[in-house]
């Protein structure tokens, strides 16, 4: 864009001459801007016409002209940033933002938060890291998963704060008396984000893709066939009853995208821009449910400019502040919640070959060493876990046996950053017991396969739990390679039988009870130990309303709204 190039050229002049009156020649300006003298004269005339500089030349060979820069580059960038954003030219604004990375935070701050521009409510969020591609079959990050729920619809969906699956692309569904046939009735007039009609045959193709994908296949393991007996009816025929099915179809692995393009969905927002420094969502004008209040949501990504706050939490991914810098004194915690998900320690027993006494001693040391309590005080964003889910207490381990721990153990930890601290502190605790802990970092946010897990005795990772906690915990046992890695073949087979039995129980409370008992057995056997939960928080200035935290710690984009600004 020409204006970006002009700003770059003017920046060179300003760096050379500043705001003071300076003596120079056209030849010197041409050398500074790496152009011909003829082009330099044209540029000087243009900058003078724009009011950026003054130029007074004198007649005669060798005479020097008087040049003065009238505006700072920062002022010009701020002016054009405002103009581009008001015009909706986010591409130009993005190019302008990339012009001076070291000044990006100051440049963007006045435009962050909620604003009305061109009669449309816009929410801009500064974000601390690059985002993964928003492919439902590959994305692993918490922010990415939240965005995928926003972009893609399913046959069913979870509303924020409600654990029961609700209608989405399907307006109703019915189940046969034997629980083996489920029919989902599609809404008429459904459309993809590009405006094309959404057809049942396309959903059938997408479901076929999901059934063959490694990540989502376990969610469909009990399904014999999926057919389209009518243009607006999808029918699932099961090998055994599965009363989690409506929950599964609302979950991330079953989000329905266009069969030819995994980034094209039918959710409340559509993906307009996905670039290194900017993600832009726009309202889906053909959305089949209540339309969001916001027209546009933008993530401005500035990973190198996020400064640690005094309390160590401002830029942490579980703490989100919406607004401009001058709003921060007014920003208040509008929503707080304890994460249902948790960070955990898993033990690969058939690799470590620890005895039950050694295992009890190891877990007792984790629970009584004060590692988690110290981390809670130091970071201020976590709480040591006492329950796996509300009403699912974690056993306390004790050991009267002084049998030594293994001389050497290998631990692999994943993000988030707190798990690195836990690993380092645990290394000190175990060293005092004569056990050397070898720590290895994994940069994956999820376990890729069981081979990765088989290389470690101990594993530290984060488990996200969605709006329907029990359904999420059941899916975890099916979907996460962790369990294939830490369970012996016989344990894995027994777990599959247990899950098959539980899924056939029609009464939800009894399903939940038996699932809780299974997890209690896993904890008592020392396979899994929840460590801590996060304290999710969203801060916002008074003018931003309807901020509702989701189970993933983000806020529901469909509920937030801004009152119109006075004219």
List where the protein language model places each region.
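Ligand-site clamp/hinge motif
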Residues: 286-328
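N-terminal lobe/hinge region of extracytoplasmic solute-binding protein
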Residues: 126-175
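Detector for C-terminal structural segments
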Residues: 48, 58, 361, 365-398, ...
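Ligand/substrate-recognition segments at binding pockets and active sites
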Residues: 21-27, 33-39, 51-57, 399-462
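Aromatic- and charge-enriched surface segment that lines or borders ligand/interaction sites
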Residues: 18-22, 41, 140-142, 172-214
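A bilobed periplasmic-binding-protein/Venus flytrap-type ligand-binding module shared by bacterial periplasmic
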Residues: 282-285, 335-361
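Surface-exposed binding/hinge segments that line
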Residues: 66, 216-262, 266-278
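A structural "hinge/loop" feature
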Residues: 130-144, 196, 246-251, 539-558
